[in-house]
């Protein structure tokens, strides 16, 4: 008894829980200390003890043991709330589909993980001896994931392809699944019997192919005599020390290791634990080890290249079938991991990013120059930092410094206040080159039918130049405008053109139909304020009241332009920015159009003028032409001050330069008729032919004048010009022949011309020419127009130093052609009003002035005036930031304190002929016809109204941006009023005076168009006052302000015609929130929006379809291409292993493998020359590929916790990389071009025949390698039996029966184990082949010396163990 006690005192007692890893270590130590037999006896006792304890405990699992986690309810509710917000953001067009998918995955994955983490503490606190808890953490077959599905939530599921299903299963198996959740679970969980068998058979088939390719690899020699090896370095730090030790143990050294002069390890010495510790202690830099890669045996392997046997720890025995062991070692974990995946149930596992949180409350400070704005993968705005960013959080008593690593997202702004534990940055996961990433295409389908529009330029995909596939160059929205195609069943000729607007009521009453190309727009009408808009549609059977005939479409880039048709129907339209008015005249207008006249005030958006700025312009009707032509300034060379250098632009204001102002008293206009026709037009006249008036030019066009025809063909269009005039064929002595391009005064020349003429030389052929004498129209420029003629004297009251002067200038350059469009008129000379002020001491510092229209209404009467204020540039402008008109809205006392202003008032004499009452909508002309010219502004009915007295402070409290308009309606209730050409500024003062400040919007500086407007009264009779000319209708931008006595102001969103609005935009305070759509009609009190749905798309996305194309529900709109990390599930891992071993895709083998191989081939061929370049290049290619393949396969298995020794992988990889392809017909008597042969065979054949064989390395998959072996019997038993046997018979192949399989098939003795002894001669076992005996061979000696003794010279990275893991 004492002896036993003494023995027990020396033993160490461990009171620890033994899990799987600890059990492995314990068994390993047992084998080292006691050997295999004694260890198996100990493990049998442990097994028996475990069975006895399990029987005694008798743990069973009941349904009541499944305890649901209490916090699950609010966690799921919170995730649903986030998903709802995410869906809203996607509906508004703020994030696109891929960002929504990513964020949804992370929301539910984080919820599921949180529940999983709560599970263990919940069990530990409530019931620590719960059988479910004990089983889940015992290390048995089940794991925490399965228990989590029982008591937590199943979460996101994968489909059979491994893609995530965007509908999480919120229930757990204890609560029970709904029908939808059950179907998703069955679909994605891969629990079917057939699918299970298929997945298991995949793993089994992989094992079969692996064994097939290496079944002949047997240890048959002791030493192959190679001096090659792979260098392993522990100092690189690229691999953990544990992996480094695992790689070394069991290997054999390929070279002696010295520490100084002392040899600490000899060549061919196997490495054990003691030697590894000694090498680490001495800090050896590089260790060269032998591997199956470097074995020189042709079809088997030697003991030293294989190393120790994994079973008993000594060198492997001769005759051991290491190939079959390797194939089973790689394939068997696949079957086990596949089964484990089935038990888990296909639950999707994502990854969450690492977040940086604020340590305390405070204000964020960082250097804004080191970051730039970007968009996160979830669509949130963020800053991206390229280098380490120091972020400071300043709280009241302490300053915290946080370092943000490079390539991270900063989620806060500078000077933002953050709270403790708030996420301030997101660290990107480290991108490894070995990560498996795949490009995924996600198609977005249309939810509704309508018309496709986009808000940016779109490029053609290069491979689909003529197709309907486009690429987006930048982030933008795709819009589907609501509408439905309406096909006509009645064969009637429609009066409606493409995209004309109509209303559904008219279609139902009149039973009219729209042509197939039209779309009925879906309208939503939003009324901002209380107003009674009455529609005046006529219901007569013969008349179409609210249609306008489309005369012609004018497209410009920046603005909407309108001009009238002859029957006074008005329509302006663009593809992207669309606008329509429905003015209609019941009776025909007078054919003689009155000369339109009027002054247009040109005030920029900010109301700011500099010296010599153009304040207003007036177009004299005498200088207006209806046809195209050329402007000539006479014989002297004169400049047009409309040129870029003559008229400079400063902040949207035109200014004159004095040196370009020239005196031109007379200019000439040479008229011509111009037609711009499409390239495909059929022209019925010839070039250089003479035609008469009303000649048919094309199928639809006739000439208005007669004369010479000139046709110019361009890329896409044909220009056809008709020159009127006389043709003169000059003689040799004719003076006219000497002149061309000149003007001839009347009475000169032989023909005695009555008027000025323009001589133009025409050369139809090289030898003949003639002269065309064209009539020229003379225009005299007089200085008779002055301020007194433009304005009555009582309108001008100049004050102080402000000066206004009248300047005339010609709009086109000398000799430049002027092309008219359709029925528009061309203005040749423009009279402008130039603003200036004196240069005295007081006004020397004044560089800018502010101008604004103001209309004051008192006692039910209106007066208009223009106010100009001079501003000193030394004092900063003190107006409100969003108030372009500036201090014009401030009181005099306030403005005087701010700045000494100088003002000029120009009063208008426009009077309303009768006061308006609240219910009287009859409108009379607003003109004073006794004057020669009219006032600045014409107002329509909706702008002329009477306001009742204010009731207390009611309006001050509501702060409505616009005063309600009583009973106002424009023509038909839907047209644009003229007042919409201006931004409104309304001022409510304590004196109850309404001041409306008009600021005209004018962004066009080159082209002006004539438009005519008509007013309508209650009796629906239309009459025409003097039309307004030269009003520019651009995309309307309305800015609403409301001010009262304490200068409170409010700004709402700007809105333009054709603009796309996202959902939930509010344009006025207390106004309705708009739906998404495109603005069609803008009024003072309402806006008409066509419903639309936005889809956000990122750069590089592919858009399907053309602009303006009809899209039906379910059509593909856009395709996203994004990178996605493949799931870590082994069901995705096994296909990856198979893909690598079958060499299906070079990209998945190594992302930069091709580049490295090409670089090596170039360098080696350049250094060694062409003959050796083939050999060495192939060698380098093979070594690079082998290391990359081993790393890839090991990464997959290590991610699943499976440890496979590198030697097994090396034997497999050695077989699939040991083939080369004969590339040239250099040795036609031995090998054929394109034949697959072994690398060693090619080298030995080349040495024997003393010729160079040109070959290149190829990677063959395991299936192809199994069909290209030395044994046709082995190939025939694997696949394609008939083909293999037929080819072997034709070639007369001989099978030497070296492998296992062919001997099994024929019933012979297999050459392994005891059967190996009779096949090997004793003399060959111990025969050594040292390197010195082969020095006579140039290739073997020199190449080995160069490559393996002078590695530093070549910097051969493939021999280092940087990536060898």
UniProtKB/Swiss-Prot annotation:
GO terms for biological process: DNA-templated transcription. Zn(2+) binds at residues 224, 295, 302, 305. It is found in: Plastid, Chloroplast. Its cofactor is Zn(2+). Its EC number is 2.7.7.6. The keyword Transferase applies. In plastids the minimal PEP RNA polymerase catalytic core is composed of four subunits: alpha, beta, beta', and beta''. When a (nuclear-encoded) sigma factor is associated with the core the holoenzyme is formed, which can initiate transcription. Belongs to the RNA polymerase beta' chain family. RpoC2 subfamily. This is DNA-directed RNA polymerase subunit beta''. It comes from Fagopyrum esculentum subsp. ancestrale. The gene is rpoC2.
């Amino acid at each position: 008894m004492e002896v036993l006690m003494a023995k027990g005192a020396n033993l160490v007692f461990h009171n620890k829980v033994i899990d799987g890893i600890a059990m492995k270590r314990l068994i390993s130590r047992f084998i080292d200390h006691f050997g295999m037999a004694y260890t198996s006896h100990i493990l049998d006792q442990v097994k028996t003890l475990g069975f006895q304890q399990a029987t005694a405990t008798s743990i069973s699992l009941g349904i009541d043991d499944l305890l649901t986690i209490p916090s699950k309810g609010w966690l799921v509710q919170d995730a649903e709330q986030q998903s709802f917000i995410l869906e809203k953001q996607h509906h508004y067009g703020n994030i696109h589909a891929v960002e929504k998918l990513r964020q949804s995955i992370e929301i539910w994955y984080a919820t599921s993980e949180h529940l999983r983490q709560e599970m263990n503490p919940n069990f530990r606190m409530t019931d620590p001896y719960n059988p479910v808890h004990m089983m889940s953490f015992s290390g048995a077959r089940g794991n925490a994931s399965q228990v989590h599905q029982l008591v937590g939530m199943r979460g996101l599921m994968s489909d059979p392809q491994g893609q995530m299903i965007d509908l999480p299963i919120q229930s757990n198996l204890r609560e029970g699944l709904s029908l939808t959740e059950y179907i998703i679970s069955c679909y994605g969980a891969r629990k079917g019997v057939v699918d299970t068998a298929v997945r298991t058979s995949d793993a089994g088939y992989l094992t079969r192919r692996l064994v097939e390719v290496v079944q002949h690899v047997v240890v048959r020699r002791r030493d192959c005599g190679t001096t090659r090896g792979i260098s392993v370095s522990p100092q690189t730090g690229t691999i953990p020390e544990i992996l480094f030790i695992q790689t070394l143990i069991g290997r054999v050294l390929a070279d002696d290791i010295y520490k100084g002069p002392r040899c600490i390890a000899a060549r061919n010495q196997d490495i054990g634990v003691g030697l590894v510790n000694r090498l680490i202690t001495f800090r050896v830099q590089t260790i060269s080890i032998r591997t199956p890669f470097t074995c020189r045996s042709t079809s088997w392997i030697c003991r030293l290249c294989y190393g120790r046997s994994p079973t008993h720890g000594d060198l492997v025995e001769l005759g051991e079938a290491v190939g079959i062991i390797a194939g089973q070692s790689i394939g068997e974990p696949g079957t086990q991991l596949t089964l484990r995946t089935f038990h888990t149930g296909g639950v999707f596992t994502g990854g969450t990013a690492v977040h940086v949180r604020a340590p305390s409350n405070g204000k964020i400070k960082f250097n804004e120059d080191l970051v730039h704005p970007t968009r996160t993968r979830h669509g949130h705005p963020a800053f991206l930092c390229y280098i380490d960013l120091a972020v400071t959080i300043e709280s009241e008593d302490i300053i915290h410094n946080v370092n943000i690593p490079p390539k991270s997202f900063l989620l806060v702004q500078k000077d933002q206040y953050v709270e403790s534990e708030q996420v301030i940055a997101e660290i990107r996961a480290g991108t490894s080159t070995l990560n498996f990433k795949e490009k995924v295409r996600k198609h977005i389908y249309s939810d509704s039918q309508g018309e496709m529009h986009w808000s940016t330029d779109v490029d053609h995909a290069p491979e689909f130049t003529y197709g309907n596939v486009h690429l987006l160059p930048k982030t933008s929205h795709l819009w589907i405008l609501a509408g439905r195609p309406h096909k006509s069943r009645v064969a009637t000729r429609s009066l409606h053109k493409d995209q004309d607007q109509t209303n559904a009521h008219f279609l139902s009453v009149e039973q009219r139909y729209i042509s197939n190309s039209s779309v009925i727009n879906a309208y939503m009408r939003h009324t901002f304020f209380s107003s009674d808009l009455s529609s005046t549609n006529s219901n007569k059977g013969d008349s179409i009241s609210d249609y306008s005939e489309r005369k012609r479409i004018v497209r410009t880039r920046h603005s909407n332009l309108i001009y009238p048709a002859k029957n006074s129907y008005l329509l302006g339209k663009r593809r992207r920015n669309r606008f329509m008015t429905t003015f209609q005249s019941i009776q025909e207008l007078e054919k003689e159009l009155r000369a339109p006249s009027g002054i247009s005030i040109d005030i920029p958006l900010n109301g700011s003028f500099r010296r010599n700025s153009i304040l207003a312009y007036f177009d004299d009707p005498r200088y207006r032409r209806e046809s195209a032509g050329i402007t000539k300034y006479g014989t002297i060379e004169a400049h047009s001050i409309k040129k870029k250098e003559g008229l400079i632009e400063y902040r949207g204001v035109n200014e004159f330069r004095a040196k370009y102002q020239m005196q031109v008293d007379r200019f000439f206009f040479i008229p011509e008729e111009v037609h711009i026709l499409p390239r495909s037009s059929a022209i019925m006249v010839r070039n250089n032919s003479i035609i008469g008036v009303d000649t048919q030019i094309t199928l639809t066009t006739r000439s208005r004048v007669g004369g010479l025809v000139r046709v110019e063909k361009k890329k896409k269009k044909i220009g056809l010009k008709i020159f009127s005039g006389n043709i003169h064929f000059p003689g040799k002595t004719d003076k006219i022949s000497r002149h061309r391009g000149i003007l001839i005064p009347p009475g000169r020349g032989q023909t005695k011309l009555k008027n000025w003429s323009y001589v133009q030389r025409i050369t139809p052929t090289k030898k003949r020419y003639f002269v065309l004498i064209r009539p020229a129209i003379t225009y005299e420029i007089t200085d008779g127009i002055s301020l007194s003629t433009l304005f009555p004297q009582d309108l001008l009251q100049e004050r102080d130093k402000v000066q206004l002067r009248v300047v005339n200038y010609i709009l086109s350059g000398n000799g430049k052609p002027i092309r008219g469009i359709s029925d528009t008129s061309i203005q040749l000379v423009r009279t402008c009003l130039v603003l200036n002020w004196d240069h005295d001491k007081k006004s020397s510092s004044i560089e800018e002035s502010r101008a604004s229209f103001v209309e004051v209404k008192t006692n039910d009467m209106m007066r208009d005036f223009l106010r100009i204020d001079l501003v000193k540039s030394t004092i900063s402008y003190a107006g409100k930031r969003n108030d372009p008109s500036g201090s014009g809205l401030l009181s005099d006392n306030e403005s005087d304190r701010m700045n000494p202003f100088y003002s000029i008032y120009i009063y208008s004499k426009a009077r309303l002929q009768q006061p308006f009452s609240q219910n009287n909508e009859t409108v009379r002309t607003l003109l004073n016809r006794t004057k020669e010219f009219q006032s600045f502004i014409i107002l329509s009915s909706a702008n002329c109204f009477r306001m009742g007295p204010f009731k207390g402070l009611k309006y001050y409290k509501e702060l409505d941006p616009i005063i309600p308009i009583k009973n106002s309606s424009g023509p038909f209730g839907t047209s644009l009023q003229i007042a919409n050409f201006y931004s409104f500024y309304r001022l409510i003062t304590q004196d109850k005076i309404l001041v409306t400040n008009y600021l005209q919007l004018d962004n066009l500086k080159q082209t002006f168009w004539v438009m005519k407007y008509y007013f309508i009264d209650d009796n629906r009779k239309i009459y025409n006052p003097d039309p307004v000319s030269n009003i520019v209708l651009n995309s309307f931008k309305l800015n609403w302000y409301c001010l009262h006595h304490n200068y409170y102001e409010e700004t709402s969103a700007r809105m333009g015609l054709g603009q796309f609005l996202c959902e939930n935009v509010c344009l006025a305070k207390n106004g309705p929130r708009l739906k998404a759509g495109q603005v069609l009609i803008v009024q003072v009190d309402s806006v008409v929006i066509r419903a639309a749905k936005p889809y956000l798309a990122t750069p590089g996305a592919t858009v399907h379809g053309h602009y303006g194309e009809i899209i039906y529900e379910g059509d593909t709109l856009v395709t996203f291409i994004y990178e996605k990390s493949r799931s870590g599930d082994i069901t995705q891992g096994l296909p990856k292993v198979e893909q690598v071993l079958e060499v299906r895709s070079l990209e998945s083998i190594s992302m930069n493998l091709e580049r490295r191989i090409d670089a090596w081939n170039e360098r080696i061929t350049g250094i060694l020359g062409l003959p050796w370049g083939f050999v060495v290049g192939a060698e380098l290619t093979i070594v690079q590929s082998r290391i990359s393949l081993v790393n890839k396969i090991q990464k997959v298995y290590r991610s699943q916790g499976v440890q496979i020794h590198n030697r097994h992988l090396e034997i497999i990889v050695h077989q699939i990389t040991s083939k080369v392809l004969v590339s040239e017909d250099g040795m036609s008597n031995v090998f054929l071009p394109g034949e697959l042969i072994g690398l060693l065979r090619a080298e030995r054949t080349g040495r024997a025949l003393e010729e160079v064989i040109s070959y290149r390395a190829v990677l063959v998959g395991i299936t192809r390698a199994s069909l290209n072996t030395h044994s046709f019997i082995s190939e025939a038993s694997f696949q394609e039996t008939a083909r293999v046997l037929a080819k072997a018979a034709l070639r007369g192949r001989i099978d030497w029966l070296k492998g296992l399989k062919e001997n099994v098939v024929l019933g012979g003795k297999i050459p392994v184990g005891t059967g190996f002894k009779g096949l090997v001669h004793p003399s060959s076992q111990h025969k050594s082949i040292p390197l010195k005996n082969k020095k006579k061979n140039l290739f073997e000696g020199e190449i080995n010396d160069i490559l393996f003794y002078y590695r530093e010279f070549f910097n051969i990275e493939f021999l280092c163990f940087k990536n060898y893991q």
